[in-house]
């Protein structure tokens, strides 16, 4: 055995020994880099969770991210070329298995009515879906307007008639309700006493003290919900609040980015050595929209319009069996276990729409629409803790600092694409350019796309087959709604996809 071989073996042996020591130190609750004990109430009181497993949020599926080709898979000659193919990487994340249902939204509006019905009815009204979206001049749809959202027969159908802004409000509400329930189940806080609201007529008190908000709980030292059976304590035995390091609270629910949504819809998996054998057209394999298997041969794999005047097939042999929307668990799920990623309803995504999105993008977690928010500090208390301003919904109020709104960063318009140097050598010239842009809505040359124009994807019950391809994209202003647009929530994954456990 020569000297080089001995040296290599010695190096490997030393590495294994050190790794073993580090592992043993960690297992024993001792820092491998300082030697100090973890979870020592008589020492530094540094708390560490050993062998921690992240829980999958309720109603969601853990999706392993990766590299894939985003963009058009088919061609519509008369359509705008706004989704050119390019390769990006998406981080692992969670997504709802089903579209948000009517029953889910009614749970939300019921909570709003229970909490704010007496003191702030306008907030309750703001959360209601727009039923008028069912009205069409040459169709009799009044029964849908009257019953679609409220009747129990439609409980399992997707919510429609909600704007992008309402969907974002729902995500924020869901974050707080899920985290509130997690703290209650862990015995950290008591369940809220909704019966006491009948005696409360002070709106500010309800928003500030009764409504649980995750950021308010973490940031506002004066906000202290009633203690539960098993509150957390510090080394001195004083009750303390839970923070993110305790592993009880979930991250924020939100709308999926366009890249996440498309990645989840195609559900492409490599079979061996990272090789993908099939470039899908739809969330299922093959280029056909009918089921090829003998058991359900010829049945449609999604809810869409088969042809002019044909929404569901002929009586006695109905195919997709849905004149309008269908139950959210209808049809076969894709390889990630997600239902209706094509058809049924289009779905809002987080992105601001730009037809040139493919020209300027990040190679990982591609997204346009960043607006960086800062909590609003109202004052400081007697010992210097920040006191944050609380908004009408009981949440920590936020603001956008100068230069923190980057929705139109390098978006291909005349200002950002052709006049970057003008801003450096002639700021006044750039200002004149902005001021002289066409803003007359009757002018055919006026831009119809703004920073409040959002992307929706997926195809719906009233769309032709072309729109079922997850790469297709359309847009609508964020304060508008339609009877064929719904949504589902997503959440960024904390930790590795291998460390996930289903929430019990």
What are these regions (language model features)?
Residues 25-40, 62-63, 69, 74, ...:
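Functional-site microenvironments in short loops/helix caps that host divalent-cation chemistry
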Residues 52-140, 155-178, 343, 486, ...:
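A short glycine-rich, aromatic-capped structural motif
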């Amino acid at each position: 055995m020569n000297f080089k071989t001995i040296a290599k073996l010695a190096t490997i042996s030393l590495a294994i020994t050190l790794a073993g020591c580090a592992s043993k130190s960690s297992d024993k609750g001792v820092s491998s880099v300082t030697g100090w004990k973890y979870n020592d109430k008589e020492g530094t009181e540094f708390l560490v969770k050993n062998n921690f497993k992240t829980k999958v949020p309720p109603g969601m599926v853990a999706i392993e991210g990766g590299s894939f080709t985003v963009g058009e898979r088919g061609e519509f000659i008369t359509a705008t070329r706004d989704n050119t193919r390019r390769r990006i990487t998406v981080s692992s994340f969670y997504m709802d298995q089903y579209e948000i249902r009517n029953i889910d939204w009614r749970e939300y509006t019921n909570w709003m009515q229970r909490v704010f019905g007496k003191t702030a009815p306008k907030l309750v009204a703001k959360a209601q879906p727009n039923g008028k979206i069912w009205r069409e001049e040459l169709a009799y749809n009044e029964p849908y307007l009257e019953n679609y959202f409220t009747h129990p027969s439609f409980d399992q159908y997707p919510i429609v008639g909600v704007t992008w802004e309402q969907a974002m409000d729902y995500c924020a509400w869901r974050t707080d309700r899920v985290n509130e329930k997690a703290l209650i189940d862990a015995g950290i806080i008591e369940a809220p006493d909704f019966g006491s609201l009948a005696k409360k007529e002070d709106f500010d008190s309800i928003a500030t003290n009764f409504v649980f908000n995750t950021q308010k709980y973490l940031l506002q030292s004066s906000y202290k919900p009633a203690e539960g059976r098993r509150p957390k304590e510090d080394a001195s035995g004083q009750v303390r609040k839970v923070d993110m390091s305790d592993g009880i609270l979930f991250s924020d629910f939100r709308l999926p980015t366009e890249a996440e949504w498309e990645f989840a819809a195609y559900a492409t998996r490599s079979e061996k050595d990272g090789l993908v054998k099939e470039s899908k057209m739809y969330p299922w394999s093959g280029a056909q929209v009918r089921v090829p298997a003998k058991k359900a041969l010829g049945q449609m794999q999604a809810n869409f319009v088969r042809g002019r005047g044909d929404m569901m097939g002929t009586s006695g042999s109905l195919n997709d069996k849905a004149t309008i929307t269908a139950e959210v668990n209808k049809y076969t799920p894709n390889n990630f276990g997600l239902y209706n990623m094509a058809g049924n309803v289009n779905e809002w995504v987080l992105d601001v729409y730009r037809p040139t999105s493919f020209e300027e993008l990040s190679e990982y977690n591609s997204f346009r629409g960043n607006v960086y928010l800062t909590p609003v500090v109202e004052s400081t208390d007697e010992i210097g803790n920040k006191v944050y301003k609380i908004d009408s919904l009981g949440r920590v109020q936020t603001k956008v600092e100068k230069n923190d709104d980057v929705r139109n960063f390098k978006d291909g318009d005349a200002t950002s694409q052709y006049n970057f140097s003008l801003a450096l050598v002639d700021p006044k010239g750039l200002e004149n350019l902005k001021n002289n842009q066409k803003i007359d809505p009757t002018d055919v040359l006026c831009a119809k796309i703004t920073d409040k124009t959002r992307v929706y994807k997926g195809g719906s019950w009233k769309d032709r087959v072309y729109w079922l391809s997850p790469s297709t994209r359309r847009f609508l202003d964020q304060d508008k709604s339609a009877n064929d647009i719904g949504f589902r929530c997503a959440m960024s994954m904390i930790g590795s996809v291998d460390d996930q456990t289903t929430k019990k």
